[in-house]
Amino acid sequence: TGVRDMVTITQAPSNRHAIQTYVTEYDDNLVRNAIMREKERSGQVYFVYNRIDTIEAMAHHLKQILPEDISIVIAHGRMDGKQLENIMMDFYAGKFDVLLCTTLVENGLDQPNANTMLVYDADRMGLSQIYQMRGRVGRSEKIARAYFFYRKGKILNEVAEKRLETIREFTELGSGFKIAM
């Protein structure tokens, strides 16, 4: 008949915690505090900014609001493959505190030391993208935090509001199946 049995993994490893998830307007103070909190526990941060044309300006802005000892590196899909690989290896090695990047971190990354995810313009992304990005943090015993920002003063359309509400509501580990339903 072509029908196959389906197996679901309903329990995460015992040492993992649900990711603390926040959906809010973008705020420099919140961004600074989130990055500083992660730095204080010797962790790293993903900052997803999905606009290559203005990513340098965002890096400059972050450097203005953060202390000088916070190191930021940029990564995006238009970079030369070897350059991108070197940046990612340096980030994995702990040489940078913040990886300012496009959605290229959506899949396949396992950096247990990165436990804070900041996503700019999250309202412009699909639910599966947002869910996958959130899954890049919380891959160790540390409590992870994910912040999904929309622009200050922006009125969200109904569909975007529903996506962000869903990601905020379903925070327990393994909630992907519930989100898909």
Question: Residue spans of the language-model regions?
Answer:
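C-terminal helicase module of SF1/SF2 nucleic-acid helicases/translocases
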Residues: 28-44, 50, 54-57, 61-181
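Post-DEXD/H (motif II) to motif III coupling segment of the RecA-like Helicase ATP-binding lobe
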Residues: 1-42
